[in-house]
């Protein structure tokens, strides 16, 4: 587990409006923490125009010895088809981003994103839990299949916000989701900030042949590479395919 925790695949900089540390500060903190890999990511939506400047800023920073620096942008799933809230001209691969980080910031409804309040209202009005979860699973799968290199940020963190939990996922739903994770080569975070996904979900990823990475979701450099919740999650999972393990 120790080598697994030497990666931090979800680190925000001041390119995100809710983060306080610069790219340089993040790299210095990662090096000081003894990390070997860091993924620098920031929040985007379809109207975002600064991704080239973000990539240029990352490229301009000297990389500390022994540290691999990856890039990405974090974007939300918009609907059950897996539409992502991304700028239309993004480049993923050589000359561009290393990955798209997919997040369930809102609930992917059948015709667009639902706020947690809207999702709760629909459930209270009679939307069956299984049908709601199918929408979420479909959204995840569509999103994963729409990108060439993906990573799931704090998977299923939307569920407590709408009055549900990961325990509400059926075995079939979880297996279908995990199979798509493995099929698409999407990385799945064990996320420190949100303490998710659960050991059951992480185990499903491993069983399906998917890959788990450690992530703090840090918005300040002092949090980079500091894991408590992730260690607890991983202790409950049978050893499997985790980066660095």
Residue ranges of model-derived segments:
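An N-terminally biased module of ancient metal coordination in phosphate/nucleic-acid-related enzymes
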Residues: 1-85, 155-179, 196, 207, ...
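Hydrophobic residues within beta-strands of alpha/beta enzymes
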Residues: 38-40, 100, 152, 188
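Extended substrate/RNA-proximal surfaces in nucleic-acid metabolism proteins
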Residues: 51-183, 235-238
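Short, charged, surface-exposed secondary-structure boundary motifs
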Residues: 110-112, 222-226
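His/Asp/Glu-enriched short active-site or ligand-binding loop at hydrolase and phosphoryl-transfer sites
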Residues: 184-189, 194, 215
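Mid-to-C-terminal alpha-helical segments outside catalytic/metal-binding sites
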Residues: 211, 226-245
């Amino acid at each position: 587990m120790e080598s697994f925790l030497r990666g931090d695949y979800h680190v925000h900089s001041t390119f995100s409006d809710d983060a306080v540390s610069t790219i340089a500060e993040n790299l210095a903190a990662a090096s000081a923490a003894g990390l070997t890999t860091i993924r620098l990511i920031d929040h985007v939506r379809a109207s975002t125009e600064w991704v080239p400047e973000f990539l240029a800023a990352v490229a301009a920073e000297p990389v500390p010895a022994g540290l691999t620096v990856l890039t990405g942008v974090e974007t939300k799933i918009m609907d059950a088809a897996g539409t992502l809230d991304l700028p239309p001209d993004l480049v993923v691969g050589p000359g561009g981003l290393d990955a798209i980080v997919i997040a369930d910031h809102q609930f992917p409804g059948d015709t667009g994103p639902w706020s947690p309040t809207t999702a709760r209202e629909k459930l209270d009005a009679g939307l069956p839990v299984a049908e709601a979860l199918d929408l979420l699973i479909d959204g995840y799968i569509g999103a994963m299949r729409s990108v060439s290199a993906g990573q799931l940020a704090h998977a299923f963190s939307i569920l407590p916000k709408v009055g549900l939990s990961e325990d509400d996922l059926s075995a079939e739903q979880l297996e279908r989701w995990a199979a798509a994770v493995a099929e698409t080569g999407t990385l799945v975070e064990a996320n420190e900030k949100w303490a998710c996904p659960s050991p059951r979900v992480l185990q499903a990823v491993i069983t399906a042949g998917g890959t788990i990475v450690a992530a703090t979701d840090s918005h300040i450099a002092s949090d980079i590479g500091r894991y408590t919740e992730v260690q607890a999650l991983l202790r409950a999972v049978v050893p499997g395919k985790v980066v660095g393990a």
